[in-house]
Amino acid sequence: MKKWFPALLFSLCVSGESSAWNNIVFYSLGNVNSYQGGNVVITQRPQFITSWRPGIATVTWNQCNGPEFADGSWAYYREYIAWVVFPKKVMTKNGYPLFIEVHNKGSWSEENTGDNDSYFFLKGYKWDERAFDAGNLCQKPGETTRLTEKFNDIIFKVALPADLPLGDYSVTIPYTSGIQRHFASYLGARFKIPYNVAKTLPRENEMLFLFKNIGGCRPSAQSLEIKHGDLSINSANNHYAAQTLSVSCDVPANIRFMLLRNTTPTYSHGKKFSVGLGHGWDSIVSVNGVDTGETTMRWYKAGTQNLTIGSRLYGESSKIQPGVLSGSATLLMILP
């Protein structure tokens, strides 16, 4: 007689920390600095200093696929990166651009230097540090922690526009500074917040830069209209018209005047600067008789000089048509 014994089948599931994971959290500081630049003239580059001050930081970004908490019973690895993301240009309250340059970055590593808008300064530490510490490994945006790390100052210079009006200036410069904490389940994990993401992090730090401009240059007009008048299509080619404005400077200065076209020309004019006027016509534009679109004027002492903008019509018989012609360019005043 056969006896059948029921088979007992066991399914065993063991959970643990065997899968690779990475948790990245960015803590943003909210420092407010102010710096007095004193009396300056446009040919100077006043400086200001941004200081890193430890304190309460707020989570503004995270990316986690690992455990939220560590209970102290298992090991993990960590690396930290301090960040400062600083704008390359800010605007004054009256609409003038201030261009920010790096003077001394100390021990910070400057990265992604080709970016048009921002400077990126990074400093990594605690690479591959093995830890058993209990705690939150993935704090959520809005949560806070205290940062105690200290890092050196960064010194910037400011290039002032040549036509910045005289007077007192109070310029607020928002920027990002904080620490990226990276926790991982394995040795050698590396992660750096992408630069395009770092640029979008909230700029919760402020630099208040105060200075007084006591010497600059001023054009007599903010716009010029050059009129060629009513012309016959047969006699318009090569017609020349011009307007003159005066530029007054309070201090010795070298000013580079450069044209930027706003309307695309119909023809190629080699090294000559031109703008499109429509109906098959271009204007070859000169600055003080120079048709390459730029010239430099020098003030050896305070005073006024004239600047002449000329326009010479150009069109080819196979393309020109009668009509109202219109085009434009922007004239920049640039300090060396």
UniProtKB/Swiss-Prot annotation:
SUPFAM superfamilies: Bacterial adhesins (SSF49401). The keyword RNA-binding does not apply. Gene3D superfamilies: Bacterial adhesin receptor binding domain (2.60.40.1370), Fimbrial-type adhesion domain (2.60.40.1090). Pfam families: PapG_C (PF03628), PapG_N (PF03627). Transmembrane segments: none annotated. Disulfide bonds join C64-C138, C217-C249. D-galactose binds at E79, G124, Y125, K126, W127. Coiled coil: none annotated. Its main location: secreted. Keywords: Disulfide bond, Fimbrium, Secreted, Signal. One of its GO terms (molecular function) is carbohydrate binding. It is found in: Secreted; Fimbrium. Residues 1-20 form the signal peptide. It comes from the Bacteria. One of its GO terms (biological process) is cell adhesion. One of its GO terms (cellular component) is extracellular region. Strains of E.coli that cause infection of the human urinary tract produce pap-pili (P pili) which are hair-like appendages consisting of about 1000 helically arranged subunits of the protein PapA. These pili mediate binding to digalactoside-containing glycolipids present on the epithelial cells which line the urinary tract. Belongs to the adhesin PapG family. Tip adhesin component of type P pili that plays a critical role in kidney infection through targeted interaction with the globoseries glycolipids containing the Gal-alpha(1-4)-Gal disaccharide present on uroepithelial cells. In turn, transcriptionally regulates host gene expression in kidney cells, leading to inflammatory pathway activation and renal tissue damage. Acts thereby as key determinant of invasive uropathogenic E.coli (UPEC), which cause pyelonephritis and urinary-source bacteremia. This is Fimbrial adhesin PapGII. It comes from Escherichia coli O6:H1 (strain CFT073 / ATCC 700928 / UPEC). The lineage of its organism: Bacteria, Pseudomonadati, Pseudomonadota, Gammaproteobacteria, Enterobacterales.
